[in-house]
């Protein structure tokens, strides 16, 4: 009788898996079609989470006029980005990858994780890029003093700690480091309402500050002084 019960449970589990189908945990499928039909050389790819994912929607001209590719996916942690790094970065053969990652690890989107492991995942992305001849621009996390989806957390100090690790690593490896945190910080580890409505994700004015900084980082990586398009708000 016991064997019959166990067998029934096993068959039920298999049936449930088949019914649900496979889960695209790393979301390989998000950019699969866009990657497949890409028919031009790629200069710069932006890898990231919701901050990168939303950037192209908030200011599409910055990406379209510069020919930049946005490969951000909302909610993703560093291990998910690392999993799809080959398909969404390496296989596209860009000259430069801009990496902005880590805030969703601090938010525990996939459960608790030590900052050292978050840092290690980001370093692994840098290693993979450089091994494949892709130059890296490494970005600090943006200031963030609260999560709208996890209001009980106070992330500002962890953000600073991870940024310290990233900045030190970038200096040691001679990788261009873009300090968004310094440019957007309201003095308390967050962002002002002018730059962010939820304390974590920038609005257009925040992205405009980021654009002027990141193009400098891209030029440092390429060893050029190229003039990139950046959006300018009309004078009031």
Protein language model features and the residues they cover:
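Sec-dependent N-terminal signal peptides
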Residues: 4-13
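Serine-esterase "nucleophile elbow" of acetyl-processing enzymes
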Residues: 18-96
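Cell-envelope and extracellular/periplasmic
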Residues: 71-74, 101-102, 106, 110
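Glycine-rich anion/phosphate-binding loops
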Residues: 76-83, 112-121
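Conserved, well-ordered alpha-helix/loop/beta-strand core segments that scaffold catalytic motifs
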Residues: 98-102, 122-123, 130, 137-139
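Charged helix-capping and loop-helix junction motifs
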Residues: 114-123, 156-163
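Helix C-cap/helix->beta junction micro-motif
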Residues: 131-133, 172-173
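Catalytic His-Asp segment of secreted/periplasmic serine-dependent ester chemistry enzymes
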Residues: 142-236
